[in-house]
């Protein structure tokens, strides 16, 4: 049913943040990738350079949707989900990033993991010391590590 929604109309933009979709977020991302024309699952505009969701109480599923937006919206350089802003541009282009003691949470770690798994990501050193990424965030980072 959800799959049919993406393919039946020329939909290019949808905002699914703050819905209790849980693990279905990954299915939505896969459907959007297959569709090929979806530019946002979170309402981020194609020319947007910064996004602040720090007051939106986003969950892990929201971070999965945002990770899709970051991959398809290249101009986005800064994203704030919690206390600290994530340097998206730096995470995409730098070889070393220090994010120690930033009070990062699981949602931040999911975004970081998504950027780590990008094909051309040059990141070789990432410092996440003294944060609050939790088990879910640690699992996302572990899944993004090179095999």
Where are these regions (language model features)?
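Leucine-rich tandem repeat or coiled-coil scaffolds
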Residues: 1-147
């Amino acid at each position: 049913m959800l799959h049919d929604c993406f393919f039946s109309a020329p939909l290019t933009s949808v905002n699914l943040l703050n819905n209790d979709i849980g693990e279905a977020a990954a299915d939505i991302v896969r459907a959007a990738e297959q569709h090929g024309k979806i530019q946002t699952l979170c309402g981020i505009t194609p020319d947007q350079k910064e996004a602040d969701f720090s007051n939106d109480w986003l969950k892990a599923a929201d971070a999965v949707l945002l990770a899709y937006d970051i991959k398809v919206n290249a101009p986005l350089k800064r994203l704030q989900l919690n206390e600290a802003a994530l340097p998206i541009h730096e995470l995409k282009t730098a070889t070393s990033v220090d994010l120690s003691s930033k009070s990062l949470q699981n949602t931040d770690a999911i975004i970081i993991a998504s950027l780590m798994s990008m094909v051309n990501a040059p990141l070789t050193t990432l410092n996440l010391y003294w944060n609050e990424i939790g088990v879910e965030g640690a699992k996302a980072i572990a899944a993004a590590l090179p095999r």
